[in-house]
Amino acid sequence: MARQLYDYWFVQFDFPNEEGKPYKSSVGKMVYNPILKREIPEGWEMKKLGELCYFSNGINYDKTIEGDTNYKIVNVRNISSSSMLIDSEDLDSICLPSKQAKNYLIEKNAILIARSGVPGATRIVEDVLDCIYCGFIIKCLPHNQLLRLYLTFLLKQFEGTTLTQTGGSILKNVSQETLKSICIVVPSEEILKTFDTQIQTIIDTMNLHINQIASLTKQRDELLPLLMNGQVNFDLSDD
């Protein structure tokens, strides 16, 4: 549903106009952009990701160095095993010097992009404190928090592909420079606010379901050995 909404609003440009009608289908004004080589809604801008976001590579650490603080860490496998939201229950823990690790903490509005595995695979992490990311991942931190979910869906279009500066499909080697050079359409602030509100509701529901599944899985794993050993019985007889 979230993906469909993104496509409808930002690929087909049928976001709601002032009357609540689909913009492009209702003959909303489109303007040709020579760099993108296509029409975009009037009033929308074209910018490079480097103008909109701060990028940084993840941590490379020495396992032989003694740490003083425990952190959750997002590895490439966490990205590969998820589709959009990273399962916080599946994250590894690592003890590192806080002086080093504090530079790699994942902020609330950050986007994570894999450099290996599935190149360009894009994910987000919700509500995880003291969480860092590994060196095979790039963090994208939008200057405007309203861009986070929009950019997440935009970047997910290019997973496992290579990328031209105008967003064409020709990221085998994902780097900060590659990402910074991508030219994208920037919607109006009003449309971004509406999209962010609607998608965040869906994300919150997805995150709730992930946590519920993790809780049920934990209960199953705890009960199964007890059932197999006969330490727990279920009375299925009728009263």
Task: Go through each PLM region and give its residues.
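Non-catalytic DNA-recognition/assembly elements of restriction-modification systems
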Residues: M1-Q4, V27-I59, V185, E189-K193, ...
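Hydrophobic/basic alpha-helical segments
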Residues: R148, Q157, T197, T201-D204
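Sequence-specific dsDNA recognition surfaces
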Residues: Y32-I35, G50-T64, R77-K108, D127
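Short coil/turn segments at secondary-structure boundaries
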Residues: G20-S25, D62-T69, S88-E89, T166-G168
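A short beta-sheet element
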Residues: N75-V76, D92-E159, Q165-G168, S175
